[in-house]
Regions:
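Catalytic cores of nucleotide-sugar-dependent glycosyltransferases that transfer UDP/GDP/TDP-activated
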Residues: 1-496
Length: 496
């Protein structure tokens, strides 16, 4: 795998969790997985790591006749948890204040930085001498690696039969390379032009198979509304594009063993959850007489925080309490503060990133809010189910694939609901659904059955990992079919 993030080594969002968990899940299925990751500032190779000096030829300037420049770096082979971590150590590229930029601006040489990651990954894999079955890239940062595979290194024996996969975690992020820096990629680009090179688009076009992180988002992404400007590219891939829902690591997210919680619990004995609820309310000055709505994430309109800010006053009037943990948009933060200031016993606003506090909210809240405008997969709703906190979500992306409205009519053979769902991204739709949840919370027997039903569901990585196995097999089958068809066309031309 080629990725820019991997938990616990480098993380800005859910991508890191997916890369780590999927690599471990594939290892548990008997595969030998390597993860290539930049050695960012502050990332120390784990104990037992092996240092390997490498020299990679990189472009020294624009123009096809410009000679390449030997570039020295170090590859660290690190023992991982079920997979091998390979850190690409090149301080001029990766020893920086941020992963992708700083002060709100991307680094202008991001294309060159992640092209280096891709070139090193391919060179190291080829040098191993063992045939590489699959090159699996994640998001635009893997675009250069996939471009390189499409433009030549298959002459190396170890890469000759390698199939390539691109997983698109969020189509809103593209990785634009300015035109004056396009030469730094050292690769031909389909999308090169006055606007530069779009690394996401390049990766989509270069990979044997492309997937995104839920079936519904895969369908949504074929439209201009959700496709992030690459909907036509995705439609062009046809049967080579699909959605595979993310899982969660149920060994890391387990209320029965979570050390961040005041009390642990499971679906058979929920008394610990009530302890956690009362503790959460007490520590943040909330009146625990009403249901607690929890929300954790990046303060951004994509996540629906503007809907919550607009609906919050009415939500309190209905009898709800609200606790929000997250950082982000300053305007949204101030709107939430405007609601919180006069209601200190009903609203807690935690303007920070705090992993342990997030766990306590997942455990202590009654209802977990995810009113996203779009949500490629979503992790919060799965953690909430695991912790017995009922999700209230907007029907989009992975939320639509995982949360079933408890009040929706059910035909014979369908699975009972596990949460509350609304359709339209409006404060009114959110409030209408919140009122249903508030009413449901008062029926304690039915509510506890709903809680236990959610906790019993399996959203681990074992199922998704097998779907990725199938994706790899399908990529190889389609590659073989394409090769046979190409050979047959060549025979026809030769015989004409």
């Amino acid at each position: 795998m080629v990725a820019s993030e991997c938990e616990p080594y480098a993380k800005t969002g859910g991508l890191a969790d997916v890369v780590d968990a999927l690599a471990r899940a594939l290892g548990q299925l008997g595969h030998e997985a390597d993860v290539y990751l930049p050695r960012y500032r502050g990332l120390e190779p784990p104990a037992g790591s092996v240092r390997q000096p490498m020299t990679i030829p990189l472009p020294s300037g624009p123009g096809d006749d410009t000679p390449s420049r030997p570039t020295e770096m170090v590859l660290w082979d690190c023992p991982g948890d079920g997979y091998r971590l390979r850190l690409v150590d090149h301080p001029p590229s990766f020893d920086r204040a941020g992963l992708y930029g700083q002060d709100g601006s991307d680094y202008p040489d991001n294309g060159a930085r992640f092209a280096l990651l891709g070139h090193v990954a391919l060179a190291a894999a080829a040098a191993d001498g063992v045939p590489l079955d699959v090159l699996h890239g994640h998001d635009w940062q893997a675009g250069p690696a996939l471009m390189a595979m499409a433009h030549g290194p298959r002459r190396k024996v170890a890469l000759r039969q390698t199939v390539t996969i691109l997983t698109c975690h969020n189509l809103a992020f593209h990785g634009w390379v300015p035109p004056q820096h396009a030469w730094q990629l050292g690769l031909p680009a389909r999308s090169a032009g006055a606007g530069g090179v779009d690394l996401l688009r390049e990766g989509i076009g270069a990979a044997d198979m492309v997937n995104t992180v839920s079936p519904t988002y895969a369908v949504e992404s074929l439209t201009a509304e959700y496709g992030g400007g690459v909907d036509a590219d995705l439609r062009a891939r046809g049967k080579r594009y699909r959605g595979i829902l993310n899982g969660i690591d149920d060994s890391l997210w387990d209320p029965a063993t979570d050390e961040a919680l005041p009390a642990t619990y499971d679906s058979r004995d929920l008394s610990g959850k009530e302890v956690d609820r009362l503790d959460l309310a007490a520590r943040h000055g909330l009146d625990a007489a009403g249901p607690i709505f929890g929300m954790v994430g990046r303060l951004d309109p994509q996540k629906g925080f503007d809907l919550v800010a607009a609906a919050a006053q009415e939500l309190l009037a209905m009898g709800g309490r609200l606790i929000v943990l997250g950082t982000g948009d300053a305007r949204l933060l101030e709107e939430l503060r405007t609601v919180a200031r006069p209601n200190p016993d009903r609203v807690a606003l935690l303007d920070r990133f705090d992993r342990d506090e997030a766990r306590r909210i997942y455990a202590g809240a009654d209802i977990f809010l995810m009113p996203s405008r779009f949500e490629p997969s979503g992790q919060g709703q799965l953690i909430a189910l695991r912790y017995g906190t009922v999700p209230l979500v907007r029907r989009t992306g992975g939320l639509a694939d995982t949360i079933r409205d408890v009040d929706a009519p059910r035909s014979e053979g369908t699975v009972a609901g596990n949460g509350y769902v609304f359709e339209h991204a409006t404060p009114e739709a959110l409030l209408s659904t919140a009122q249903r949840a508030l009413t449901g919370w008062t029926d304690r027997e039915r509510w506890l059955a709903l809680v236990r039903r959610g906790m019993a569901e399996d959203h681990s990585w074992s199922g998704p990992a097998r779907l990725y196995e199938q994706l790899y097999r399908d990529a190889r089958r389609l590659r073989s079919e394409s090769s046979r068809a190409s050979a047959e066309r060549s025979e026809v031309v030769a015989g004409s």
